[in-house]
Amino acid sequence: MTRVIVTRPLREGQPWLQVLRARGWDAQALPLIELGTAPDQTSLNAAWQALQTPGRTYQALMFVSAAAVDGFWAARPATDSTSRGDGTRSIRCWATGPGTRRALLAVGIAPEQIDAPSTEAGQFDSEALWQVVSTGLRQDARVLIVRGADAMPGSVDALGGSGAGRDWLAQQLRAAQIEVDFVVSYVRALPVLDSAQCALARQAATDGSVWLFSSSQALQNLQRILPGQDWSMARAVASHPRIERAAKSAGFGAVKLARPVLDELMASIESLA
């Protein structure tokens, strides 16, 4: 049985582990990104306050990932925990992909409030999201981009080099005369792997395991954890062209591109198994 290495942060990776195991794969968790609490809670509190202040609120909140949603709602004022008097009832919520959309639904955002690329979109990224939202914006609008921050300088996030996805979207918004604010709702850090996890990673570099990557930073962290490891016999499935390029640059011998939807991931895994 081919082993599949799920590299997503532990909480985000659990659904994939369950599905893969149900389909008969030997799926193993090897989280290559550690998620933590945002260091500046003051900025998060200010963002929530703006949502409750007439004349200061946003037309849309853009979330770069499911972790961004979770971190943002973790800072929600306790007095609004049941009333939805938090200013989000009428604001559009933008998601780049299905995982982020599910996270928004889980915190109580109504499906009709969410803008996201369709499940048939060629990619789930900022460019695809822009095609959905660009025609419905007011020129005097404000958009808040809720993102993560890297604990280590120079890291690459799931949207591309140095936050390329969110920076590209912010440029499009500003060119359309839209005011853009940012707030950090979580941090991404290098995980500390134990000896068994390091042994699993080394073995999976040569034994035919299939690695699943949904973040370029996960690849960077893997290279930091195992410097000098030869990946020429390793096989991987990447969820975005930027991540595909990063895997090839890291030396992975075989890399398949697949959107992060179940049927495509399964087909790519099977083609490498």
Question: What do these predicted regions represent?
Answer:
Residues 1-273:
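Conserved beta-alpha
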